[in-house]
Amino acid sequence: MNQVATIDTANYEAMAKVMGMVGEQNSDKAKSTLARLRINHSAIMGTAEIKGKSMNLEVVGGGTYRLEVPDTDETYYASSISIRPYMQRFMYKRFVKGRGTIKNMFVKTVMADSLNVDLKDNTGGLNCGKPAGYIEDFKALPEDMQNLIRQIKRVRVIFGTVNLTNPTNANGDALNREMNEIPFIWEVDQREAFKHVGEPFQALLKQRRLPVQYRIGCETDERKLPNGNTYYVPNVNLDTTEVLPIGEDIQDTFRSFVDWVTNYNEYITSEWEDKHVNNLSSEDASLVEEFITVDTSVEN
């Protein structure tokens, strides 16, 4: 078996594994400190005293961007933002409503460069249950499968840094500081939003330009549902008038995003491996175990 035979203090992760340090890690995994960017579809209401009466008021409007920062456990809002996209990935996800003692959960796949391949998910399956390949006749599928596919969302995952314009807190109070260059992840899963957010990347691809060299301004547009409710989609504007410099700090942030995706994919793959074997028939599981035994004997 190949092992690292030279001590490299600049590569802690690889050396720690070789030196048997991995087993000393705390079993309680640290939560991701990457801020989450979303669109806030519903207004946040507050109360104010007007002429001696307490009245309900809208303190944060619907259609604002919401940034959840786990480091401080705070959430910030802004009607307009500017993002510097470093990279994008693609995945599938499906919400599963809990019943009884079973909690709500998301079935999620690994992240990939495209959706043109089968993606392992955290339940031991592929594509969150969506059949592999192109579906020529959706209506010919069994009704249960049609319903399952309707629940599965394509997700465009954006990694970058964000500037919030005139940010507020959840009470609608203006912040006394700027919120700039904050690393974030944005899972874009609404169909129209998926398309809109992808347009700047398509434009840059045609021009053979890298997304990290430009900014994208983001606001929102309102949409109406048949029942009268509203939701919002991103309104994005790619700014190619300024080419942003790439210094060592940008390189470090980019590497941290790549590491984040690697760690996420390793976790999903580990879940897939555990549950895929458990989902096999007893005969298939025995066959897998036999292969593992043979492989182990050869290795030793």
Where do the model's predicted regions map?
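Extended serine/threonine-enriched, polar tracts that run as long, contiguous segments within proteins
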Residues: 153-241
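OB-fold ssDNA-binding interfaces and closely related basic DNA-contact patches used
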Residues: 1-176, 227-231, 241, 286-300
